[in-house]
Amino acid sequence: MMCGAPSATQPATAEIQAIADKVKSQLEEKENKTFPVFKAVEFKSQVVAGRNLFIKVQVDDDDFVHLRVFESLPHENKPLTLSSYQTNKSRHDELTYF
């Protein structure tokens, strides 16, 4: 993977689901609602001074959100940050940089 270029879209893994779960409360606070369903479906990663993860998350039968999560470098010891998100996405909406 090239520094700065997002990876190809990949199926979500247990690690990606765990990351999505860790920022779920940040999204719920920003949206002022709870998401009983929160299933990571696919993701892209981008190496920066740390790592950006673009994660497609299913929040209802036909409703998805796209998350951009920043993971700092290990020696910085900082928590995961929900940098940005997009709501009202469908299963077929492509994950792109936002």
From Swiss-Prot:
Q: Name one GO biological process term.
A: amyloid fibril formation
Enumerate the InterPro entries for this protein: Cystatin_dom, Cystatin_sf, Prot_inh_cystat_CS, Prot_inh_stefin
Which cell locations does it reside in? Answer: Cytoplasm
Q: Which Pfam families match?
A: Cystatin (PF00031)
Keywords (alphabetical) are: Acetylation, Cytoplasm, Protease inhibitor, Thiol protease inhibitor
SMART domains, per the entry: CY
Q: Which GO terms describe its cellular component?
A: cytosol; extracellular space; nucleolus
Query: GO molecular function terms here?
Result: cysteine-type endopeptidase inhibitor activity; protease binding
N-acetylmethionine PTM positions read M1
At which residues is there a site annotated Reactive site? G4
Q: Where is this motif: Secondary area of contact?
A: 46-50
Name the source's superkingdom: Eukaryota
Q: What is its main location?
A: cytoplasm
> What's the stated role of this polypeptide?
This is an intracellular thiol proteinase inhibitor.
* Record family assignment: Belongs to the cystatin family.
Query: How is this protein named in the record?
Result: Cystatin-B
Q: What is the lineage of its organism?
A: Eukaryota, Metazoa, Chordata, Craniata, Vertebrata
| UniProt gene name | CSTB
